[in-house]
A protein has these predicted regions:
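Glycine-rich beta-strand-to-loop/alpha-helix junction loops that act as flexible
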Residues: 21, 78-80, 101-103
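Beta-loop-alpha module in the N-terminal Rossmann-like domain of NAD(P)-dependent dehydrogenases
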Residues: 58, 78-93
Length: 184
């Protein structure tokens, strides 16, 4: 497969950042401030979109990806694996460079690519890193970075997310599974 040579990040292309404010520890505002400061210190132009509702991420990522391509910049996703997959998919469709700042709960993508666990350290790593190709997968037009799931498992994940929205993270997960139709 042919690859396109990309300049190192030290060439200072602008950043277009999409942050999922609800990811991980829900520190979106603080991370946005850190990115603004880091970009300013590095002399890099940037725009930041802080997204409060996860369902808005794909549309906002598409707009941001077009902006990144037009500015010859980098589309940077900040959030969990789902956020990063949505932002990467938008970058692929737009033909924009993509980078990630893992900021979710599990951060499988970040761990598999050697990103630091703390978002501030990951941001510094991206500032001083180089662009390089990564492997992505696609099933039925859906891009994924870590894995794709079929059958019961994705339904359980959707149910878990709905449960967390309704009851919060502190309720025992066992209560949810005890009431799930599969177990009746």
């Amino acid at each position: 497969m042919a690859t396109t040579a990309r300049p190192p990040l030290d060439a200072r292309p602008p950043w277009v950042v999409v942050i999922n404010a609800a990811s991980g520890r829900q520190e979106g505002e603080a991370i946005a401030g850190f990115i603004r400061d880091a970009l300013g210190e590095a002399g890099i132009q940037g725009s930041i979109r802080l997204v409060s509702h996860a369902e808005e991420i794909p549309g906002i990522a598409e707009q941001a990806a077009r902006q990144a391509r037009e500015r010859h910049g980098i589309l940077v996703g900040v959030g969990g694996d789902g956020t990063l997959s949505a932002v990467a998919a938008a970058a692929i469709r737009a033909g924009a460079a993509f980078s990630a700042v893992p900021g979710g709960t599990f951060n499988y993508f970040g761990r598999s690519h050697g990103f630091p666990e703390e978002p501030q350290a990951a941001i510094r790593a991206v500032l001083h890193g180089e662009l390089r190709p990564i492997q992505v997968g696609q099933v039925n037009g859906q891009v994924f970075l870590v894995n794709a799931s079929f059958g019961l498992y994705p339904q359980l994940l959707e149910d878990r997310e709905a449960f967390k929205r309704q009851w919060g993270r502190s309720r025992p997960a066992g209560e949810h599974f005890r009431q799930h139709p599969l177990f009746h």
